[in-house]
Each structure stands twice: as structure tokens, then as C-alpha cells.
Amino acid sequence: HPTSLIPLSWSMRSYDLDVVVTRGAGIESRHRVHAAVVDSSDRLIGTAREPETVTMWRSCAKPFQVMPLLASGGFDEVGWGDDELALASASHGGEPEHVAIAESMLRDLGLEEGDLACGPHEPLSPRGARIVRDAGARPTRLHNNCSGKHAAMLARAHFSGWTLAGYERDGHPVQLAALQEVSRWTDVPEAKIIRAIDGCGVVVFGLPLDAMARAYARIAVAVSRGDEIPTRIARAITTRPFVFGGSDRFDSLVVEQTNGRVISKVGAEGVHSVAVFELGLGFAIKVEDGATRAQYPAVLHMLELLGALPEGLSPKLADYARARIRNTRGEVVGELLPASA
């Protein structure tokens, strides 16, 4: 693939990447970014700061967590399709369309909202949050951005004859199957993967950043080969970008802007993983201080360096690339910008 698109500095030394917060002509704050870029041969070809730094994969692991359900045949047995698969892989915005799919998934299993182990939170999408407020309602577990993943995990337990209670807990067969899948794609032995509790209650995996990039590079390669399970996941995400994120959600906009040539997966605390299909690449970043506001400019900056973005970002995606900072009068007083050395 065209490695000439990779900055020479990445193959020679660590590429120091920051996202700076400006105010006027000055820099007010600085977010340090760690990154790893892996190619189709599993080679680490680009780094920013400490590519081996260990952190939690958070929601970036979702495409791998749903793989055991697909492999078991349970997904097809219940008759689900691309909408359900996109939602199971998503950090969705909690809009009515997302809630309806999650509710339908539970209904197909003979289950209800109370069977979900995730707690409720306000929809991540401003549209979704506004709809809940205007209805005078409270968010439910279905609005949780991980409700699709949880429904898929319940399906895995249901069709395997495992107990549904505690499906989210470390040691449950559902979580052990996910651990095995993560280990297989990252090449990190199960015993060396840190296990903790994610924001939604399921097991979360801690591993090196370059291992995360390796897994997403392998997804890109597997899709190019036509491997069934990765291809089905990629097809669901790229043909259902709204389900995968929502109105103006970053992951959805990246899929749309690149016509499905790139899959971007957001995670909490400034972690992000990306597969670039045409280049057979995967990369992962971690904003050191966990600031979400810094991860989007960093991801878009790296996609630009790799030549993976078309010329001329859509206005909505451009807002993520250089987020404007406004004061209480609505005046633009600064912005977030990627800066490298």
C-alpha cells in the first residue's frame, strides 16, 4: 500500500502530537496525544509519543465483542440484520430510532428493558436529549449508548443456554468469549489483558495502544479478503452510519464523509480506534488526560496525514476538526487545533 502517505518522521522517530486550545493568538491549554499506526503486515509504522502505553479500550472494543454472537449462529437464528449489528457495534446517540431497534432486539429475545445491565443516561445526541426533555420523560436503559451491545450479549447467553443473570460480570461465559476474541485480534495473551468494569457495567479491556491499532488493521485486511464476520460488521456499520452513531455523531460523519472507506470508533476517556480499508491500516489514539474534546481533532489530523480523507470536509465534520470556543456572548474566542513537532 502507499506508505509514502505516512510522514517520514513517523518511521524515524516519535511524532509528538498535541491538541492545543487557543485563545486569540495564544495557546491556553495543551492535550498530549499518544498514537500507534499498524499496517497490513502487523508492522508498527507510525507512532506519537508512547505507542505501547496501556489504557482501557472502552467502546472501541464493541465490534469484537459482538463477534462471538455472529460466530455462534445466534445472530442469524433470531433473524437480525444490519440495523441490529450496527447498533451492537455502536456508541449510539439514544435517538428514537436507536431506542426502537434496541427495544425490538429485546422483544425478539422475549426480554425487556429491565434485563439490560446498563444504567440509563441522557442521550448522547442533542436531538435525542431534546426529544426526551420535550416529552417530559426520563432516559431509560434503552437510551444508554451501549444498549445494542448489551442486547447482543443477552442474545449470546440466550442462544448458548447460559444464565442471563450476571451476563455482564467478569467470569460469565459471555465475557470470557469476548475476552478470547479481543486476545485473538490484538495478539495480547488473555492473562495479560487487564479486566475492569466499563461505564455501562460490562467487562472492559486494558491493553497496549499498538495492540488496539493492530486489531483494527486486521479488520481492514480481513474485510479486503472478504472474511465473513468482519465483512458483515463492516457492511452494517458503513451502510447504517446513522444507527452506528446518530445525528451529527463523529463516527457516523466519518463513515459518510469517506463513503465507507474508513470506520472510526469512539471510546470514552479520549481513546479512539480507526480502520482504513484502502490502505490496510489501523490506528489508535489515546488523549493522555482523557479529554474527549481533543480526540476528534487528533483523529481527523491523522486521517489527513494518511491521505484517508477526501478534500473538503463537510461543515459538520469540519466543526470537529477545529472546534470553536465561544464565550458567554457567543463570540468565537479560540479553537482546538492539532499541533505537532
PLM features: what roles do these ranges have?
Residues 57-75:
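Active-site SXXK
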Residues 62-66, 212, 280:
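Residue-level preference for non-acidic, small/hydrophobic
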Residues 48-56, 88-92, 135-144, 196-203, ...:
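A short glycine/serine-rich beta->alpha loop
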Residues 5-52:
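Beta-lactamase-like hydrolase cores
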Residues 71-78, 110-114, 160-166, 172-193, ...:
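Bacterial peptidoglycan biogenesis and beta-lactam-recognition machinery
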Residues 5-12, 81-192:
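Active-site-adjacent helix/loop patches that line small-molecule binding or acyl-intermediate pockets
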Residues 30-35, 151, 179, 269-272:
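Short glycine-rich loop/turn motifs
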Residues 217-341:
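Structured C-terminal helix/loop/strand segments within mature extracytoplasmic catalytic/sensor domains
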